[in-house]
Regions:
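Glycine-rich flexible loops
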Residues: 1-241
Length: 241
């Protein structure tokens, strides 16, 4: 197997692991939502799951490959159109982001109705000033929406799609996954705190900014992803095949 095929297989395995871990953490929504990865050796082709498969069914071998026009070039022709629109927005406009993750987790989606999601705990400081917002435009089936999604996300790889869900992107599977992990965690805490009648203590913008800079020394997913892959192996190693 040549180097390109080996690289492609590793991307497939990492992407399949993201699906299985999303199911494990309870962030999936039956067959809906989507996670994608740019195919090595191509400029705009990317892998996504076959429409109709639940996340616990996804494995490296049953992913499909899609080109920039939305044509399935490898695998069955079962394509989620909204998934293609949302993910191609990032793959076409942010080449530094190789993995893209869209989710509507039940525990956090209510926070997408906030004008802006407040920060309350240490973990969310790593996202301070890095989260973009995109207003809901109805179902994401209009190709014209792609440039607005890409512009609103910016280079931070974090986007709250208001009244809809969340979108994260990263150079690696681990970075992309852990951005989603911390974004969901931030929203869960925000919902819990804002539902309380107790007086809230919060830090100053200067403190949040300083903590955000401190977190830049830690790359999301660098240490967590190997541990998450080991967890995936213990849960069900069939994702690799």
């Amino acid at each position: 197997m040549n180097d390109l095929l080996l690289e492609e297989q590793q991307v497939r395995v990492d992407l399949a692991a993201m699906f299985r871990l999303t199911h494990h953490f309870g962030w999936d929504d039956t067959i809906w939502n989507h996670i994608t990865a740019r195919a090595p050796g191509t400029e705009h082709n990317f892998f996504m799951h076959r429409f109709g498969h639940s996340y616990d069914e996804v494995c490296a071998s049953n992913l499909i490959k899609v080109d920039e026009e939305g044509t399935v070039v490898d695998g069955p022709k079962d394509l989620n159109t909204a998934g293609f629109i949302i993910h191609s927005a990032i793959h076409l406009n942010h080449p530094n982001h190789k993995f893209v993750f869209h989710a509507h987790p039940k525990s956090a989606s209510a926070a997408t109705a906030f004008e802006e999601i407040p920060h309350f705990i240490q973990d969310s400081s790593m996202l301070y000033g890095k989260v973009g917002y995109h207003d809901w435009e109805g179902l994401s089936v209009d190709p014209d929406e792609r440039h607005r999604i890409a512009e609103n996300m910016g280079e931070g790889g974090l986007l709250v799609m208001r009244n809809h869900g969340f979108l994260t992107a990263g150079a690696t599977a681990g970075e992309c996954f852990m951005k989603m992990y911390y974004l969901i965690r931030m929203c869960e805490v925000a919902l819990q705190v804002t539902s309380s009648s107790l007086k809230v203590k919060n830090g100053s913008p200067e403190l949040w900014q300083r903590a955000s800079k401190q977190y830049e020394a830690f790359s999301p997913g660098l240490y967590e992803w190997p541990a998450l892959l080991r967890k995936c192996d213990r849960l069900d190693p069939s994702y690799k095949f």
